């Protein structure tokens, strides 16, 4: 909802289509879209942890490379290992794994659709789909993002929480 509001404000339009490959040409004229054929991309990276940081950095850098006609064999397959990642996968699947980067500056906003992700491995209890993706010969690297939320810090003591169920399980 926030993105729609930002785009309406910037583009002065009231009808923003849902993001997908088929609606790229229908986006407001000020929105930057991929200039490359996404169907020609092949995976080179599996990335675990598709948070905002990843989408605004690694994914965007690869997108910019692809915009220059390079790196089309370095597309991203997203992955997650937590139950909440299932909802994110479904949201991204519904928009053909496209994401939107809104860059704010003192002089305004730039809105760009990022197309470097081409798939998101299904989340399974045994991580079988993730392991299968990582084992593919075309995958050159596996990357991951770890944020402060991944460190299991006790909010009271500000110390590592070794009693957290996830840590005990590991």
Where are these regions (language model features)?
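Non-transmembrane, aqueous-exposed alpha-helical and coiled segments at domain scale
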Residues: 1-170
């Amino acid at each position: 909802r926030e993105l729609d509001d930002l785009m309406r404000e910037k583009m002065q339009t009231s009808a923003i289509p849902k993001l997908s490959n088929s609606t790229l040409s229908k986006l407001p004229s000020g929105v930057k879209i991929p200039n490359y054929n996404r169907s020609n991309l092949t995976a080179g990276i599996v990335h675990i942890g598709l948070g905002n940081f990843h989408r605004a950095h690694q994914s965007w850098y690869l997108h910019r490379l692809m915009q220059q006609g390079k790196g089309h064999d370095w597309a991203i397959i997203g992955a997650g290992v937590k139950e909440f990642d299932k909802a994110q996968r479904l949201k991204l699947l519904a928009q053909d794994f496209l994401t939107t980067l809104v860059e704010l500056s003192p002089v305004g906003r730039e809105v760009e659709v990022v197309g470097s992700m081409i798939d998101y491995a299904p989340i399974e209890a045994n991580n079988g789909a993730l392991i299968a993706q990582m084992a593919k010969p075309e995958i050159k690297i596996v990357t991951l993002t770890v944020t402060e939320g991944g460190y299991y810090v006790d909010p009271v003591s500000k110390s590592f929480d070794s009693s957290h169920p996830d840590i005990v399980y590991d």
